[in-house]
């Protein structure tokens, strides 16, 4: 059985490598042909701005619209961008794909030190270029064997998986076979196969403190819940595994964050995608995900300990009123309420009501409101 899983995953990997090579070579060929035809080389990309985000009725997520920006050798800046694009493309084809190697985003920045004029000035520049290649090839960076620098998040709950590692496939029960930290989500979750589960819901949690509180209080057992620690703004792998569990296993998802504008964006990135990676929304976003809390109305109802909104918080909330991801009446009412009360609260504020309050009172009540229990 393990051998069959290995063969299947290895076959998919070879197919992915072949596709990535074809797409990257196609991009290089396009630029080369423009030189041959004595046309100033250029490539077009979707504009990565809030104004170019639109709702897809087909996939129920927010994607890029028709507005485009151009990378053209008409300008010195554009010429350097294309030069760096060709160097990176060559590296990915002849180092990563040809030799089954991989690099982190940080390593790519340092690797470019040997690229003469194509050297990146800062890592943000190399990160954007990989995003450009994703847009130009319609493939995720994992196809190029690019890894994120950050660790994946963790999850804990009643689900058994099979993960293909360099040492072969291994079966892991994410309650019985892991420590208190939970199962470490790998950067490429396509190497995971779901085996069995008894889960009734997935609770995606922003902070480590609340993740640990729910585990200590036995919430995963009481509600057959898979707990996922988002670690703040969630990594791609975290969003992808949530989407896969929701779509493939039909497990409902709720997102539990702090009660501030930055946390609402964490929910939005899980449910609808992020602006700078809207090209990946259909691959990573879970539009069925519900916002559990912490709501501004909870601050009022439960008289939670709060902090005063900063000017940056107020500006962010006002910006969200025009963000297409928050255009529903529910979000408009909650955001306006928060602006009116001028307060924000953390998840841990529930501890002021007792260590069991969040799992015995707040979450059961809120889950009933959402129709999840």
Curated annotation (Swiss-Prot):
One of its GO terms (biological process) is DNA topological change. This is Type 2 DNA topoisomerase 6 subunit A. It comes from Methanosarcina acetivorans (strain ATCC 35395 / DSM 2834 / JCM 12185 / C2A). Keywords: ATP-binding, DNA-binding, Isomerase, Magnesium, Metal-binding, Nucleotide-binding, Topoisomerase. It comes from the Archaea. Transmembrane segments: none annotated. The lineage of its organism: Archaea, Methanobacteriati, Methanobacteriota, Stenosarchaea group, Methanomicrobia. Its cofactor is Mg(2+). InterPro entries: Spo11/TopoVI_A, Spo11/TopoVI_A_N, Spo11/TopoVI_A_sf, Topo_VI_alpha, TopoVI_A, TOPRIM_Topo6A/Spo11, WH-like_DNA-bd_sf. The active site is at 110 (o-(5'-phospho-dna)-tyrosine intermediate).
